[in-house]
C-alpha cells in the first residue's frame, strides 16, 4: 500500500495488491433487477434502478468491471442516500456500499489513527470514536450518510470539516481495476468539494477512510451557536461528549428528521464571495449573516438569503422549504425529482434577483 501525493497523482497511481484483485470471482455478481430506491434515498423520492448490487467488498466491484454486460451500464454509487436527488428511474447499475468495520489502526506521540469501512453509518462511527475516548469528530455528529460519502463532500458543520482530521483513504478505480490510496493533499479538499467530485468523478469507489485523531485535544467552539448551547446548558469546561450532545441537540431542533420528513439536508451551499462584494452587500443589507474565511473571502449564509426572499415554510407542489431552516428543502409527500428541482430553481432565481448571488445546489442530481 502506498500513498498517492497530490503533485504526482496520475504518475503515482498504482495498485497496492494485485494478488488480492486476482482473487475476485470470475462469476457475475448477484444482480437484482428493477430495484426500488425510495427507501434508499433520504428525500424519499420514488424511483427504480434497472440493476442493483449490494457491495460488500472490492471483489464485487472487480466482478462488475470485468462483466461485459455490467461494465457498460451507467453507475450510481450509493451510501446512505442522504445527499441525492433522483430525477426519475435510474437506467443503470446502483452499487450500494454495505462493507462494515471500524478499528484503531496505530498511534504515535500526537495522534491515533482510526479507520472505518465505507458502508459504515457516519454518525455511528463518530459515536464509536467517542466511546473509545478518541475526540476530534464530535462537531460532525448527526450528519446523515455513510463514511464513504463523507470525503466526497468534505462534510462540515459547527466550525469543523472532515479534512481537519482526515488521514487517508482507499478506493477502487473502475478505469484500471486497481485499489489506490490517497492522502489528504491528494484529495484536494475544499468547501464541500474534493477530487471525487472532479477528476475521479464516476471513476472511484471509496472503500475505507482513515482519520488522525489528536491525543492533545482542544474543544472547537468557534461556532457561536454551539458555544451558546453549551453555556445555556451550564457546561463550563466541555468534553468531546458534551460538544457532541450539544451538536445533536441543535441539529434535532433545527433540522427535520429524514425518517419522518424526507429531505437531503442542506440543499444549497453557502456561497463564498470576495470581501469587496461582501462590503457592497453589507451596505445594502446590514443584517446579512456572513463569516469571514481565513483567506479573506466571506461565506454568506444561504439560509438567511432564502428566508429574506420569503421562502421559509413555503411550498411549490409537493416540495417545500422547511419552516425552521430555509436551507432545507423537504418532501411534503409524493414529491418527484422534478418537483424538487422546480422549487430549487425558483429559489435560486429569487436570490439572484435580490442579492446578485448564485446559489449552488449541494446534493448530487441523478
Where are these regions (language model features)?
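Aromatic (phenylalanine/tyrosine) cluster motif
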Residues: 9-10, 16
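Phosphate/pyrophosphate- and phosphate-bearing ligand-binding catalytic cores of soluble enzymes
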Residues: 31-33, 38-45, 84, 179-338, ...
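Anion-binding (especially nucleotide phosphate/pyrophosphate-binding) glycine-rich loop
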Residues: 22-175
